[in-house]
Amino acid sequence: MEHKKIAFIGAGNMVRAIVSGLVANGYPAQNITATAPSEARRLPLEQDFGIRTTSDNIQAATEADVVVLSVKPQMMADVCKPLQAIDFTNKLVISIAAGINCSRLDDMLATKLNLVRVMPNTPSQLGLGMSGLFAPIHVTEHDKAFAAELMEAVGKVCWVEQESGINNVIAAAGSAPAYFFLFMEAMQAEAIAQGFDKESARLLVQQAALGAASMVVSNPETELSTLRENVTSKGGTTAEALRTFNEHQLSDIVAKAMQAAVARAEEMEKLF
């Protein structure tokens, strides 16, 4: 990975995860800057990873080859306005803010950007993230490769060909950890109802989930349906549980939930 100068505008949990992954993989800490108005936000990054931090967004972005916008969507316009004075011609801009499309970011920074939009998810904080990426047609393969390598510091990446695909990434991966948490919550609650204490119920559920996910990852050529069928004996307990799920249309519920996530993402784009 080319060791460009990176400026993270923002210093939240996702920035911390990316910086941690980069430094752990040998990226020079002196080439990384993170900005935040609060010293309480900046200091831990400086102390833990040896990177530079500052409250001066303009200086950090001016000196950088790559500018990563990592602020809340509702704050983006205010953060970008002072940055309009910067010449972004030879810079790569990466946005990890939800709900703000490429055209809107061009408007916010008053220029046509070399821009990659990224939609990560929270397991990135453990290096197990899944990020969707989109780049307009004028962005070079070189810049796209750098953006992908940046996000591979915290997990896997998937490119989408149309910007609308970012909203589909939100439904399939960005919001997905919460789906699994909800399912696990329901299982834990029923295990408690059946007599387990809270800690034992959680252990049973989390280890089953970890094992199932690990089996998926360890068998990339095996269809998910085949893995399910391999656990299901005709007339057995698993078959009866799955029959109950199907009777209550679990697949339809999942589809409707993912469609609702996409619809909400589309609505959010109109807000900013």
Curated annotation (Swiss-Prot):
The kind of enzyme this is, by top-level EC class, is oxidoreductase
One record GO biological process: L-proline biosynthetic process
Its function, per the record, reads: Catalyzes the reduction of 1-pyrroline-5-carboxylate (PCA) to L-proline.
Q: What is its EC number?
A: 1.5.1.2
Q: Quote the SUPFAM superfamilies the UniProt record gives.
A: 6-phosphogluconate dehydrogenase C-terminal domain-like, NAD(P)-binding Rossmann-fold domains
Name recorded for this polypeptide: Pyrroline-5-carboxylate reductase
Family per similarity comment: Belongs to the pyrroline-5-carboxylate reductase family.
Q: Name one Pfam family in it.
A: P5CR_dimer
Oxidoreductase found in the keyword field: yes
- What does the UniProt keyword field contain? Amino-acid biosynthesis, Cytoplasm, NADP, Oxidoreductase, Proline biosynthesis
For this record, an example GO cellular component is: cytoplasm
Q: In which pathway does it act?
A: Amino-acid biosynthesis; L-proline biosynthesis; L-proline from L-glutamate 5-semialdehyde: step 1/1
Q: Work out whether the entry's keyword set contains S-adenosyl-L-methionine.
A: no
Query: What GO molecular functions are on record for this protein?
Result: pyrroline-5-carboxylate reductase activity
Signal peptide: which range, if any? none
Reaction(s) the record says it catalyses: L-proline + NADP(+) = (S)-1-pyrroline-5-carboxylate + NADPH + 2 H(+); L-proline + NAD(+) = (S)-1-pyrroline-5-carboxylate + NADH + 2 H(+)
Give the UniProt subcellular location, in the record's own words. Answer: Cytoplasm
Please indicate which superkingdom the organism of origin belongs to: Bacteria
